[in-house]
From Swiss-Prot:
The keyword Transferase applies. One of its GO terms (cellular component) is cytosol. CDD domains: AAK_AKii-LysC-BS, ACT_AKii-LysC-BS-like_1, ACT_AKii-LysC-BS-like_2. Residues 263-337, 343-415 form the ACT domain. GO terms for molecular function: aspartate kinase activity; ATP binding. It catalyses: L-aspartate + ATP = 4-phospho-L-aspartate + ADP. NCBIfam families: asp_kin_monofn, asp_kinases, PRK06635.1-2, PRK06635.1-4. Pathway: Amino-acid biosynthesis; L-lysine biosynthesis via DAP pathway; (S)-tetrahydrodipicolinate from L-aspartate: step 1/4; Amino-acid biosynthesis; L-methionine biosynthesis via de novo pathway; L-homoserine from L-aspartate: step 1/3; Amino-acid biosynthesis; L-threonine biosynthesis; L-threonine from L-aspartate: step 1/5. This is Aspartokinase. The lineage of its organism: Bacteria, Pseudomonadati, Aquificota, Aquificia, Aquificales.
Length: 415
């Protein structure tokens, strides 16, 4: 039995007409011999509307109640999707996370999937039904509803594909993964194949096509992912194991993330245990710290800077100010006007001079670097937000413009 997990994003299911378009794509997969399992996001704007509604009731709603509320968005979408398939003559059954079941840990609003029961899905498929599963949500061992965080429907889809030993098709409002955001770089190029490792870096660095945990799942369980447009029949981008990617280019893509906030703890006593105290408290609050910079010690004191996602900034500020007071630091300075620019490519493992070229390009454009972080296949620089788009365009021109193995945004090769 050849199963295909097909995930549809919020824009794809944003209207009843679009849901019918998505349903017809599912039927095409069925006609090609696949047994489809559908995963749907909430309709576009639905989650934001529910968040606004909650905040009218409570400025900081309890996370358990937020999960219960937000799960409604996907429940509405899957019911409409299943109704549409049934109307078109194809039996379908909608399933919430708890009905599958998708078992998660107990962390509300950012839950992680622990295991998935597939027996009910397989039974429905054998009986001739198309299962339509709610993305973004799960249930704890104690039957508490949880959500997986923004973009969690991608994670649901890839996790289901892993459990069912299937390929995964991500249907979205873009035609694939590009070398840069086409809204910033009009001649950005669609990537035909990209490795898990490269996609993981791009997702973690701000690329919005895939959610980071979904790529982690794919890499761990070897799930091949096809990212494509719901509104086009053209081939998208395949996310695959490294050995399937023929060309190991130095730079595969460039990302910008303006959803970062930088904190600087000024005049921190430079002694053992201080950094641990700050970052352990942030970790205990489930706040992910990204870039960290510590200045050279002067007269027994130092400055320590780090970045977090803007969604966690208020909570992080509250925590760090308390610790700063406790350890005798002078003050905590917050900067919301920063951006993280990154270049990613598996060929960077064996290429030389890439960092120097990147820093030179930024310098020639008058862009100052506030922090740097690197891995084997990426280099990230923190800069002022006002220079973000200029930096992306300049780096794209330097590293990618002349690469002929990519497809241009309009689908034509450079041959």
């Amino acid at each position: 039995m050849k199963i295909l997990v097909q995930k549809f994003g919020g824009t794809s299911v944003g209207t009843l007409e679009r849901i019918e378009l998505c349903a017809k794509r599912v039927i095409k997969a069925l006609e090609k011999g696949y047994k489809p399992v559908v995963v749907s996001s909430a309709m576009a704007g639905e989650t934001d509307s529910l968040i606004e509604l909650a905040k009218k009731v409570h400025p900081r709603p309890p996370e358990r109640e937020m999960d219960t509320l937000l799960a409604v968005g996907e429940q509405k979408a899957i019911a409409l999707f299943a109704m549409t398939l049934n109307k078109l003559g194809y039996p379908a059954v909608s399933l919430c996370g708890w009905q599958v079941p998708i078992i998660t840990d107990n962390v509300h609003t950012k839950a992680r999937i622990r295991k998935i029961g597939i027996s009910r899905l397989l039974s429905l498929i054998e009986e001739g039904y198309i299962p339509v599963v709610a993305g973004f949500q799960g249930v704890t061992e104690d039957w508490e509803i949880t959500t997986l965080g923004r973009g969690g429907s991608d994670t649901t889809a890839v996790a289901l594909a892993a459990a069912l030993k299937a390929d995964c098709e991500i249907n979205t409002d873009v035609p694939g993964v590009f070398t840069a955001d086409p809204r910033i770089v009009p001649n950005a190029k669609k990537i035909k194949k990209i490795s898990y490792e490269e996609m993981l870096e791009l997702a973690s660095l701000g690329a919005k096509v895939m959610q980071i945990r979904s790529v982690e799942f794919a890499a761990k369980y070897n799930v091949r992912i096809h990212v494509r447009s719901t509104f086009s029949e053209e081939e998208g981008t395949w996310i695959v194991p490294e050995d399937e990617v023929m060309e190991k280019v130095a730079v595969r893509g460039i990302t910008v993330d303006t959803k970062e906030t930088r904190f600087t703890v000024v005049r921190v006593p430079d002694k053992p245990g201080i950094a641990a105290e700050i970052f352990k408290a942030l970790g205990d609050a489930h706040i992910v710290v990204d870039m960290i910079v510590q200045n050279v010690s002067h007269e027994g004191y130092t400055d320590m800077s780090f970045t977090v996602n803007k969604t966690d900034a208020d909570k992080a500020e509250e925590i760090v100010k308390k610790i700063a007071q406790k350890i005798g630091a002078k003050e905590v300075v917050r900067d919301d006007k920063v951006a993280k620019i990154s270049i990613v490519g598996i060929g960077m493992k064996s290429a030389y001079g890439v960092a120097g070229r990147m820093f030179d390009i930024l310098a020639r454009n008058g862009i100052n670097i506030k922090a740097i972080s690197t891995s084997e296949i990426k280099i990230s620089c923190l800069i002022d937000e006002k220079y973000a788009e200029l930096a992306v365009r300049a780096l794209h021109e330097e590293f990618i413009e002349e690469m002929e193995e990519f497809e241009t945004i309009n689908g034509k090769n450079k041959e």
